[in-house]
Amino acid sequence: MEKNSKLGKKLLATGNGRCNIMNAGEPVYFGERDFAHQVLSYCPPDSVRAFLEGLGLVLRTGEGGRMYPAGNRGDMVLDALTTPLLGSGVQVLLDTQAEKLEQVAEGWRVTASNGESYTAPSLILAGGSCAAPKLGGTDSMYQLLTPLGFELARPLPALCALETQRKPLQGLSGLRLLARLTLLAQGEPADAAQGEMLFGDTGVSGVCAMQLARAAAQALDKGQEVVLSVDVTPTLGLRDTAMERKPPEKPGQMAETARQWLLKRAGFLPDNRLLQGALPKPLADRLQGPSIEETAHHLADWRLQVTGVRGFDHAQVAAGGISTRGINAQTMESALPGLYLCGELLDVDGDTGGHNLMFALATGILAGESAAG
């Protein structure tokens, strides 16, 4: 039963159309992360990969462990998943949404938007989250499950751009650079990431900024003050340039390294042009201070007030969802016999890079095998 007019609409949008299907590196999950790790102990990444290769897919591994179909096309993944489905005679109901769930003597009854009711001994729910409504994201599954006693962790946008005060960004729109970003909530480091960031008119994006949206949304939802500390020393070659999530550290601890770098440049450049040729001019002008000490501080800890995140329309996933309490991580069966939950519907969200699809696949494999008996 598919709400959209075709299968795999969200799948085709992942990885900029290339379908970043899974990740070969260390799993990175949030929310009820212990549950995610339990799931991956029963259906590990190697098993997910074997499942996909058993469908004929050839996978390749890129930067950061990201795995794609060798042809770099999402429709290859969709074809691999749907061909055996349709070939087995499975009836697919498109443009059809579940509107009511009932536990009955025969198992579960679903009343659908087409006016029909369907009854089966087992029911698998993989309705996703409210992220990306243009691709079919909705909160309808939450509304169906909470009356049945399931707990809901408030959904918030994740993996989206950060909105900041606009004045400090004037003249920087479109600028890309390598940076280490640290998110501060009430003055304390909450999360950090390193990689390419992109300046916009209303905030910052890029992978490393998007990775911090979850923590930013949760802190703002609690009414906390949220600040982004931008460290541009990776662009200057003063830090490693690996594009990956980093553990939080004390903001500005690279200031002394930056100061020593500036002192060397002071031997051949005027004090008011120490960043000339090192950073794009609009940013160099913004970070250049009246003294070497102040410029060094700006390079290692330039602060932007975070005012929000872009919202579900622009979010790749949602933080929050249905609690995994009572769900068997080996089978994905809930405390209500015959009812299985999987994927992004649950209070588990992963980092960018294929972690979310890998969790969806692993839970789907476990649920399908268990429900089929």
Where does each model-flagged region fall?
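Glycine-rich loop(s) and the adjacent beta-strand/alpha-helix scaffold that form part
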Residues: 122-168
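A conserved FAD-binding loop/helix module that cradles the flavin
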Residues: 129-148, 333, 347-373
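Residue-level recognition of phosphate/Mg2+-coordinating polar/acidic sites
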Residues: 6, 21, 41, 47-50, ...
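Short beta-strand to alpha-helix junction loop
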Residues: 36-44, 63-83, 93, 132-137, ...
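A conserved beta-strand/loop capping segment in the N-terminal third of enzymes
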Residues: 12-78
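Short loop/edge segments at beta-strand edges and connector loops
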Residues: 92-96, 154-156, 310
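Glycine-rich FAD pyrophosphate-binding loop
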Residues: 1-16
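A conserved short coil-to-beta-strand element within the FAD-binding core of flavoproteins
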Residues: 94-107
